Amino acid sequence: YEAAADRNAAERTKEDEQQDQSQFGSGEVRRSAGRDAVGAESPSCSAAGEVRDHKHRGCGHSNNDRDEYAEKNPQSDQHTRKATRVPRLLPFHVHCYGQIPPMSFEQAAIPSPPPPGYHVESFTDDERAVLSRFFTNVDGPVFGIVNLPEVVKGALFARYSRSPLSVRRLFLDEFVAEPDLGVNAIATTLDDEDSPVGLARAQGLYERVFTQYGDDSVAQLGGAHIACEQASNILTKALEWGRLASYLEQSTRYIFYDRRLGARYRYHIPRELSGTPLEDEYRETMDAVFETYSAMIGRAVPFYESLFPKQESDSAFVWRSTIRAKACDDLRGMLPAATTSNVGIFASGQAYEMLLLRMRANPLREIRDYADMMLTELRIMIPSFLTRVDLPDRGGAWSEYLASVSADLDARAADIVRPLEDRPEVTLVDWDPEGETKVAAAALYAASDLPDDELLAYVRTLPAEDRSALIRAAAGTRGNRRHKPGRAMERTSYRFDVLSDYGAFRDLQRHRMLTIEWQRLSTQHGYVTPDAIADIGATAAWDEVMERTATLANRIERFHGSVAAQYAVPFAYRIRYYIDMNAREAFHLLELRSQPSGHPGYRKIAQDMHRLIRDEAGHRTIAHAMQFVDHNTYDLARLEEERRLAARRAARGITDE
């Protein structure tokens, strides 16, 4: 097999050299038509007409990266991996060659090289023995969770939100020793048939059944849990793009980013900058930002403790959690988009396939690298669902299509040059003036025998009060915000253009049933400064961070393109995006995101949207039915929520530590 693979690799190299010369000519570096689709030419990729070990133009990835990593780390994943050296053809970025070579199942078993600066956790031999039974690898940033009850997998991901620890460390510290979970008992009963390697037989059975009876929808019926750790806040948005998947991300509300993870603070170093003159400046700036953030956290916590003293009725745990959330909320704007996070994903094979196709078409190396690592791990758990992702004429063609469309639109948008004018943070740009009439007609549809158009004609003849009565009947008597009206509310929609800080956008982007699209993060729209920054005496430090990161982002954009420059931009800078949602989804988003415990940034956006639906669209009956939208302001917003959670824990016999 190795000899055949080596011959295949040699033939591919020769074919690629011929294709390279025919497409690009001697010494020409192909660049996408779209602005910054790849970025500036890499010095390491501009040798005249050469393809050295498949160093890709615009990205510089080597075919030997994975093999070298596997050779240096033969025990990196003892339970499923083999140290056998199989030539690994890394995915060509579609902007480089326009074709993505396939990856065999054997190649998928070779560990992917981790991102630059990835912090590898240290585990004892005993810990590794336990982890190897339940995780598809022990060392990498991307891994699957296997052989555990579904509720335990969900609980593991749930802990991500409030913990700085990795899921593997959480599993060892909080789950393994828990007698009620029986993890140790599960581990002792597992054999090779239960391990990921044992999937080979099931895969063969599945393929026989699929060939006879299956279609694409079969891939909706099997799923997997996968973790992506130490991922930047640019990557997390790419991971969480798809609607039909479930995500849980580490929260900036509950975690201080004032401690280093290994040798540096929790930020990603993009490969686009590796080995360039800007890498040192990037590291120095990021270190300075996190040091300032750490100093301001140290100032904010005691300030809020004195401003909001503990009440006798509150436990120390509730009070500390509330103070911590307040400090995190106010200072998160300092964190750059390069800040790393942990993300847990549960999705079907079909959802993963589409996610990987999008990621492989992305111009950022980090996103493509994680796609490569995810494909490796998913092929251990659900290999049959992901056979097409890297086939040149299937997934390769699909990813190339996505990339070419993006590049074409980038080029066309670059021709539009207009000055940016001041406008409100939230603008209602489109709605149906007859929306309430249509909702009233839709409310009758399921209970009637008439066609849709005849019901609409009938409702148009009714007095306004009768139409409002139909909408109120469709909404019903709601006891809380979880009592949502039915699908009649989907008959009308609202389209908002929003210009908010990146932190608020991150929270709203998680609403995936609506339609949301965003522009690149940059410094051109300015930044927001919460009122609390002046209260804790941090205005000068805040402004200095914003100015210094803007300088760095502008330099990265100049030499490496605006896509890579996003990493340097803090959460406080504003990003433009639109949200298009029907009234039923508006019930969910506006009532949830305006709750007292929410962040002030997105609470204001939700409140503005509600006012615009009521006043500008004139849909007063629908707006009135959204009775749990909260327009009040709060000083210590999280306190009541923490009290409610404490009461729930007490009712179940759980004491706060």
Predicted region positions:
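A conserved ligand/cofactor-binding region detector
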Residues: 97-99, 103-657
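Short, strongly patterned local motifs
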Residues: 1-102
